A protein has these predicted regions:
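A short helix-to-beta-strand connector/capping loop
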Residues: 2-3, 21-24, 112-116
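N-terminal glycine-rich anion-binding loop in soluble enzyme alpha/beta folds
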Residues: 5-70
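Short glycine-rich or small-residue beta-strand-to-loop segments that form or flank ligand, phosphate
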Residues: 84-92, 118-121, 135
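Short Gly/Thr/Asp-enriched flexible loops that form oxyanion-binding sites at enzyme active sites
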Residues: 89-111, 131-133
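Acidic/polar active-site rim loop that often engages polyanionic ligands
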Residues: 113-114, 128-138
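Conserved small/polar residues in nucleotide/adenosyl-binding loops
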Residues: 148-149
């Protein structure tokens, strides 16, 4: 197996169990439900059935992307372990999250010049994004190297 981290955003519509079973790391987006902020922790803080029931009952919800500082801390934990990173973001067509990831990448490349961070725009969302991550996990598990992105 290759020694790089395959990573994405929590918006890939995969369960925590699936992320773990495929060895895919993820960073959590944020959302607000009726004025209260939550981390998109895959249904731990607010179970999905409660979330959708709240929407059904007229709750307002909005999302916010991961910021550059959050990406920096997230990526740095892997870099300290001597790992390169292939991070695939939610589509740039619906989110600016790729910009936050790129800012963190540029900052960390100065501190860890021996490590590589690859940021890829999935151009997808939801289940399509999740399927793409599964395909990348298959490639990684079959010897794909991060620099072959």
């Amino acid at each position: 197996m290759n020694d790089f981290i395959l990573s994405c955003c929590s918006t890939a519509d995969l369960t925590e169990e699936h992320f773990n079973s495929r060895n895919i790391s993820y960073i959590c987006f944020h959302y607000e439900l009726n004025g209260k902020e939550y981390e998109d922790d895959l249904g731990k803080s607010v179970p999905f059935d409660q979330f959708y029931l709240a929407l059904q009952n007229g709750a307002s919800a909005k999302t916010s992307q991961v910021n550059a500082d959050e990406f920096e801390h997230y990526f740095e934990s892997f870099l300290k372990e001597g790992k390169d990173i292939l991070h695939v973001t939610l589509s740039s067509g619906i989110s600016g999250v790729i910009n936050s990831a790129m800012i963190a990448k540029e900052t960390l490349e100065e501190r860890y010049p021996e490590r590589k961070i690859y940021i890829v725009d999935s151009l997808g969302a939801s289940s399509g994004y999740g399927l793409f991550m599964n395909r990348l996990a298959d490639l990684r598990d079959n010897g794909y190297r991060s620099e072959e992105r």
